[in-house]
């Protein structure tokens, strides 16, 4: 029978000092012996997805204490990728994931906490907390802040839906008037919550639900809706049950590594491919799998991508649907239900409620459930009122979207495409693979061959695109923006958005060893591995070379002979210590970022730290 970790600090005369300090936090004699459960919050006024979380930690803590636990809350950092985008701030986004994971480990282990409730929401916060949860392997439940409502405005006498990406594209489009750009900017992000499309934040929160570490509805129920409050209340109660199951009943099925096992990881990736999620999720799932000591690699993702169809299409891949529409169609479990009927899921998995996948679908799949309360929850919709307050409205759709032939979520028979929304490409240009979000690629450019224009920074590429130096048919390559080379593996949302602004969204390709925002669409290929700073072929290409992309056949080739590539590699290595560094880039890199770069692996490993360098 495992002993409560917290007993280390609460029992025995030699811990009198620790108990004295616990008492100073409000604990009393009756609390010593109860499980100490930490509420890992991520409130900040910098991030719309987190601006409403201040009071939600207290809500969870009250339920923990009412259920027989002791609650202790702390906060992690949270970077807003959209605000950090397009300048030096983006260098810090991905490294913040490791800091978040480490900070959770530090706080939990330093104070011997027994379990956690993780209140996350946005891009690097959810994966950072996931990595920590699987590293620590103590009972955990995730409850996120929820998605933002989609923006709406009237343009050309038509009401259209908007999101952050629309503001970026219109702001850079020379054909758009200042008045229209301003109107879109003011309408794009109307409420608190994670940006309203299937961008990285919402993709990750959906995957957490598929992994079994959060409750049904967590990935799609709007941040503003009153129904979301119940998820927080339930999390506080349920974590005490999970904690006692493990520590008092020796039930290891309550631990995250036994819930989010390899079968669950495969299900989560299957969901990601079917819903056309952000390419960043690949990076984060690979990193989380390493923390869980699960053998889950790019090869597994490649195999899944070849058999899973696209059953859901959401912004930025279409303007018709946003997360509020996914929820109306049944949310994550609506998609999982269709995947299950197609025989594409591992059924022998459980979630934090203790339900198997078939049991969960029976209760929560809107196409089969008889539970009217569940149907009501999935009718929770937007209010269209600007607010930063959680649970501030209780509007509902008049009906559910259960049309699996022409609705937001489709059945296998009526899939958007036979191929899924993500694909892994291999070739002499990316020997260890690269990722493309096929859900956002127009059918006309699934095969694309063109001349290369090489840039050694995102800034240079943006200047060239906006300056008219990139033309139809070009393959834009941005290198030395990987985990080491950036450092920090910047997102390339501005270059892809500006290609659209210049009318080149369906006429050019963009390839990088950096990564893309979940808001990216178009022929955008990222995570090229090995990266330039690690000696990848991407470091050897020159202006005017030709790259051939063949998504249906999962291929990306630099059209040069092996002899020419070898000769260029020899010339590159002759540069000595500067061999795998950009030639003409001036960039201020802080000591903190240099420390990150010194241990970072390429994207095919999840951009995690290289344990071999630390003797691990």
Swiss-Prot record:
Cofactor: [2Fe-2S] cluster; Mg(2+)
Entry EC no(s): 4.2.1.9
Co-factor binding comment: Binds 1 [2Fe-2S] cluster per subunit. This cluster acts as a Lewis acid cofactor.
Keyword set includes Transmembrane: no
Catalytic activity line of the entry: (2R)-2,3-dihydroxy-3-methylbutanoate = 3-methyl-2-oxobutanoate + H2O; (2R,3R)-2,3-dihydroxy-3-methylpentanoate = (S)-3-methyl-2-oxopentanoate + H2O
SUPFAM superfamilies: IlvD/EDD N-terminal domain-like (SSF143975), LeuD/IlvD-like (SSF52016)
Residues at which [2Fe-2S] cluster binds: 122, 195
Residues the record lists as N6-carboxylysine modifications: 124
Keyword Disulfide bond: no
Binding residues for Mg(2+): 81, 123-124, 491
Molecular function via GO: 2 iron, 2 sulfur cluster binding; dihydroxy-acid dehydratase activity; magnesium ion binding
A GO cellular-component term linked to this record: cytosol
Biochemical pathway: Amino-acid biosynthesis; L-isoleucine biosynthesis; L-isoleucine from 2-oxobutanoate: step 3/4; Amino-acid biosynthesis; L-valine biosynthesis; L-valine from pyruvate: step 3/4
InterPro entries recorded: Dihydro-acid_dehy_C, DihydroxyA_deHydtase, DiOHA_6PGluconate_deHydtase_CS, ILV_EDD_C, ILV_EDD_N, IlvD/EDD_N
Keywords (A to Z) from UniProt: 2Fe-2S, Amino-acid biosynthesis, Branched-chain amino acid biosynthesis, Iron, Iron-sulfur, Lyase, Magnesium, Metal-binding
Residue pairs linked by disulfide bridges in the UniProt entry: none
An annotated GO BP: isoleucine biosynthetic process
Top class in the EC scheme: lyase
Active-site residues (renumbered): 517 (proton acceptor)
Function: Functions in the biosynthesis of branched-chain amino acids. Catalyzes the dehydration of (2R,3R)-2,3-dihydroxy-3-methylpentanoate (2,3-dihydroxy-3-methylvalerate) into 2-oxo-3-methylpentanoate (2-oxo-3-methylvalerate) and of (2R)-2,3-dihydroxy-3-methylbutanoate (2,3-dihydroxyisovalerate) into 2-oxo-3-methylbutanoate (2-oxoisovalerate), the penultimate precursor to L-isoleucine and L-valine, respectively.
NCBIfam families: ilvD (TIGR00110), PRK12448.1 (NF009103)
Subunit architecture: Homodimer.
Family note: Belongs to the IlvD/Edd family.
Protein name according to UniProt: Dihydroxy-acid dehydratase
Organism lineage string: Bacteria, Pseudomonadati, Pseudomonadota, Gammaproteobacteria, Enterobacterales
């Amino acid at each position: 029978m495992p002993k409560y970790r917290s007993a280390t600090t609460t029992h025995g005369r030699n811990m009198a000092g620790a108990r004295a300090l616990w008492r100073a936090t409000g604990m009393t004699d009756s609390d010593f012996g109860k499980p100490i459960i930490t509420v890992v919050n991520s409130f900040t006024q910098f991030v719309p997805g987190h601006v409403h979380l201040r009071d939600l930690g207290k809500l969870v803590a009250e339920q923990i204490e009412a259920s027989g636990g002791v609650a202790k809350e702390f906060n992690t950092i949270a970077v807003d990728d959209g605000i950090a985008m397009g300048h030096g701030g983006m260098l810090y986004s991905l490294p913040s994931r490791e800091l978040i994971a480490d900070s959770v480990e530090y706080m939990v282990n330093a104070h011997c906490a027994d379990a956690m409730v993780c209140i996350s929401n946005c891009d690097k916060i959810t994966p950072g907390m996931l990595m920590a949860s699987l590293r620590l392997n103590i009972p955990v439940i995730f409850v996120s802040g929820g998605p933002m409502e989609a923006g709406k405005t009237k343009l050309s006498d038509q009401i259209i839906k908007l999101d952050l990406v629309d503001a970026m594209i219109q702001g850079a489009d020379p054909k758009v008037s200042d008045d229209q750009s301003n109107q879109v900017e003011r309408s794009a992000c109307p409420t608190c919550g994670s940006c309203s499309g299937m961008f990285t934040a919402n993709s990750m929160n959906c995957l957490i639900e598929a992994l079994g570490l959060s409750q049904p509805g967590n990935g799609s129920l709007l941040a503003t809706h009153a129904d979301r409050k119940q998820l927080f209340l339930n999390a506080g109660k349920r974590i005490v049950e999970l904690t006692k199951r493990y520590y008092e009943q020796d039930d290891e099925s309550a631990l995250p590594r036994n819930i989010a096992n390899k079968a669950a990881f495969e299900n989560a990736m299957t969901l990601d491919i079917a819903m056309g999620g952000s390419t960043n999720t690949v990076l984060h799932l690979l990193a989380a799998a390493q923390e869980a000591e699960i053998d889950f690699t790019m090869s597994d993702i490649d195999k899944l991508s070849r058999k899973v169809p696209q059953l859901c299409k959401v912004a930025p891949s279409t303007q018709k649907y946003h997360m509020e529409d996914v929820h109306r169609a049944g949310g994550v479990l609506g998609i999982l239900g269709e995947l299950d009927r197609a025989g594409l899921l591992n059924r022998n998995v459980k979630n934090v409620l203790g339900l198997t996948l078939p049991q969960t679908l029976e209760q929560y799949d809107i196409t089969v459930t008889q539970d009217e309360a569940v149907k009501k929850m999935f009718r929770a919709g937007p209010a269209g009122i600007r607010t930063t307050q959680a649970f501030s409205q209780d509007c509902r759709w008049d009906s559910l979207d259960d049309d699996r032939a022409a609705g937001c979520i489709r059945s296998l028979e009526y899939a958007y495409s036979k191929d899924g929304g993500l694909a892994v490409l291999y070739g002499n240009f990316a020997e260890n693979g690269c990722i493309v979000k096929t859900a956002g690629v127009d059918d006309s450019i699934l095969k694309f061959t063109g001349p290369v224009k090489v840039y050694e920074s995102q800034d240079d590429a943006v200047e060239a695109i906006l300056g008219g130096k990139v033309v139809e048919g070009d393959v834009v390559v941005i290198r030395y923006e990987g985990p080491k080379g950036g450092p920090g593996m910047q997102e390339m949302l501005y270059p892809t958005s500006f290609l659209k602004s210049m009318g080149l969204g369906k006429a050019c390709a963009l390839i990088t060893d950096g990564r893309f925002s979940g808001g990216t669409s178009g022929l955008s290929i990222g995570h090229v591995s090995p990266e330039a700073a690690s000696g990848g072929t991407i470091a050897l290409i020159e202006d005017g070379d030709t790259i051939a992309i063949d998504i249906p056949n999962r291929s990306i080739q630099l059209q040069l002979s092996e002899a020419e590539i070898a000769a260029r590699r020899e010339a590159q290595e002759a540069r000595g210590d500067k061999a795998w560094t950009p030639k003409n880039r001036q960039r201020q890199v802080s000591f903190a970022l240099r420390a990150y770069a010194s241990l970072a692996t390429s994207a095919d490993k999840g951009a995690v730290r290289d344990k071999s360098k630390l003797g691990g």
